[in-house]
C-alpha cells in the first residue's frame, strides 16, 4: 500500500499535534512531506526529529535560523523554509496528496487555496478559509477536482451522518435542517454583569475541548459557532434558514441532521479532535484514533438549550453577516481576529470584542469580491478600521 503523503500546516497547534498523533499510529498509511509551525521552533524541531519531513516552514528568517540550528544540532536533514510563499509551495507540491489546513485565521487562506488549485485532498480545519472566501474556495476546489473534508468536529459530525451520496441538495435527500451543537463555553451560566471583568486567562479555559487561545476566546463569545455556521453554509450548500445552533454543554453530541420524516441523526463521541481527524485521514476506512470509547454508564444527563443573543452577541452578528453575504463574512472575521488579539493583549474588555465587530460591520464595504486579492484587501481595510476603533476604547 502506497502511503498518503501529507503536508501539515499548523503542525505545532492543537489540531496539528492531534493530526501527528493519529499519523504516528499508522506509519504504513502516511508519510509527512512538510510541517509548518509559525514561531514555535522548539516544538517544530522535535516534530521534525520524529517524522523526518522534507521541509519545515516557519514565519520569518529569524525563526528559520533558530530552527536550522536546532535541526543541525540533532542531525535532522529537514530543509527549512520561511514566509507565506513557502506555505503555498509545500501545500501545492507535486509530491503531496493531502494537506491538513490547520493554520488559525485568514492567514491560512492562500495556502489552502493553492492546495485546491492543485486538486489536493484538503483536510479543512481552518474555518476562516470558508468564512472569508467560501464561494471562491469551493468553486476552485470543484474546478480542480480537490476533495474538501471537514475536520471541525461539528462539520465532521454532519459529514458522517449525511447520506454517502449527498449531492449538496438538501431536498433531494429529504433533509430539513442541519443542527450544529455548541458547548456554550466557560461563561454559559455566568452573571452577565461580570462580563466586563472577564480576563483572558478565564476566557481561554474551555470546559471540554483542548484548543488554542484564539479559538478558545471565540468559543467563549460563541463567535466560533457563528463562523462554523458560515462554514457549514458553504461546505454543505445549506441555505442559512436551514442551519440551526443548539447549546449542548456536555459536548457529547457533536452535531445533527434533521430529516423530513421526523428522524434526527446525530454523531456522538468523546470531545477529542483525533476522532474527526482520523475519520478524514482514513476515508473510506475507519482507523484507530487513540480516542477511548464513549462510556454511557458514566454519562449524566444530556441537556440542550437555545443560545441567548444577549449573552452571545457575536453569534447574532455572525447570523447577520451570513444572511447579508457578499464581503460581510470577510469583514466579520477580520474584525473579530483584530478584536480577539487586542483582548488577549489586555487592550480591551471581553465585551468590547462584539462592539468592535459590530462597528466594522456598520462601515461601507463591497457587496461581493470575486478574487483573493480583493478579499485580502478587504481583510486589511477591516483590520485597520478595527484597530482604529479599538484605540477609542482604551
Curated annotation (Swiss-Prot):
NADPH binds at residues 12-15, 39-40, 126, 128, 212. Pathway: Isoprenoid biosynthesis; isopentenyl diphosphate biosynthesis via DXP pathway; isopentenyl diphosphate from 1-deoxy-D-xylulose 5-phosphate: step 1/6. Disulfide bonds: none annotated. One of its GO terms (biological process) is isopentenyl diphosphate biosynthetic process, methylerythritol 4-phosphate pathway involved in terpenoid biosynthetic process. Keywords: Isoprene biosynthesis, Manganese, Metal-binding, NADP, Oxidoreductase. It catalyses: 2-C-methyl-D-erythritol 4-phosphate + NADP(+) = 1-deoxy-D-xylulose 5-phosphate + NADPH + H(+). InterPro entries: DXP_reductoisomerase, DXP_reductoisomerase_C, DXP_reductoisomerase_N, DXPR_C, DXPR_C_sf, NAD(P)-bd_dom_sf. Catalyzes the NADPH-dependent rearrangement and reduction of 1-deoxy-D-xylulose-5-phosphate (DXP) to 2-C-methyl-D-erythritol 4-phosphate (MEP). Belongs to the DXR family. This is 1-deoxy-D-xylulose 5-phosphate reductoisomerase. It comes from Neisseria meningitidis serogroup A / serotype 4A (strain DSM 15465 / Z2491).
